[in-house]
Structures are given as structure tokens and as C-alpha cells.
């Protein structure tokens, strides 16, 4: 017999550094999920990844207090900042405040990596989404 789903929870957790402190602890604790069990499982699943990389995770918890989780790709903004070698986007994007530049080849690489998480039919559509995110951060797309 299949387990009865009690609900889902979406969090963004840094790879390899899940711990029971806020925001993870309270979010899981109030739903009756074993916090330490999740932290151990998540850290084990992300040990090969770059430490500190933000990982969106969807946790499905069941009425018997068990859970499963699905990890997604890091956000597009993380990849854009990494490729452009910047700490943060422009404070005034679109008003002359440029944070940096990124090439079409870099945009394609990011789009291909994020393809399964984006709502795009093909790579060109995914590239358009990534370019839009880049422009909203104040990055100039060249090439």
C-alpha cells in the first residue's frame, strides 16, 4: 500500500551544509519530519558538489513522518554570477548600472545545464530565459 502524502515543502539549502538551525529546522520540525535524518541524507547526497552551492530541494513528507526529497539544479542567478565572476548583480539594472558581461556561449552552457528545470521547449527558449535573468541582474550579453 502506498504511503499517504501529508504535504510538500520547498527549500533552498547550501550543498553539504544542511543543519537543524533556521530555516531548515523550524520548517521541518513543525511538520513532524525528523530534522537530523534529513540533514544527514541531504549532506550525503551533496557531498560531491561544491560546498555552499545553493540547491533547491522539494521535500515530500508523509503521514507516517517519513520523507523523500528531490534536488534540482542551482538557480540561474548562481550560475550567472559564477560565469561573470561577480559577487552580486547591479543595484540599478536597466538604468546604466552594469555588473559585468557574459557571452552567448556561457548563456548556452547555463541553459543546457538548467534545461530540465526550466519551462522551455528547446535550448533557444531556455537561452532566452537565461538572457532575461542576466539582463535583470545588470549583466550585458555579448557575442
From Swiss-Prot:
One GO term describing the cellular component: cytosolic large ribosomal subunit
UniProt KW ATP-binding keyword: no
SMART domains: RL11
Record bears the keyword tRNA processing: no
Pfam family of the protein (one): Ribosomal_L11_N
GO terms of biological process kind: translation
Keywords, in A-Z order: Methylation, Ribonucleoprotein, Ribosomal protein, RNA-binding, rRNA-binding
The record's account of how the chain is modified after translation: One or more lysine residues are methylated.
GO molecular function, one term: structural constituent of ribosome
Similarity annotation: Belongs to the universal ribosomal protein uL11 family.
Subunit structure: Part of the ribosomal stalk of the 50S ribosomal subunit. Interacts with L10 and the large rRNA to form the base of the stalk. L10 forms an elongated spine to which L12 dimers bind in a sequential fashion forming a multimeric L10(L12)X complex.
PANTHER family listed in its UniProt record: 60S RIBOSOMAL PROTEIN L12, LARGE RIBOSOMAL SUBUNIT PROTEIN UL11M
Reported function: Forms part of the ribosomal stalk which helps the ribosome interact with GTP-bound translation factors.
Protein's UniProt name: Large ribosomal subunit protein uL11
Species assigned in the record: Allorhizobium ampelinum (strain ATCC BAA-846 / DSM 112012 / S4) (Agrobacterium vitis (strain S4))
Upper lineage: Bacteria, Pseudomonadati, Pseudomonadota, Alphaproteobacteria, Hyphomicrobiales
Gene: rplK
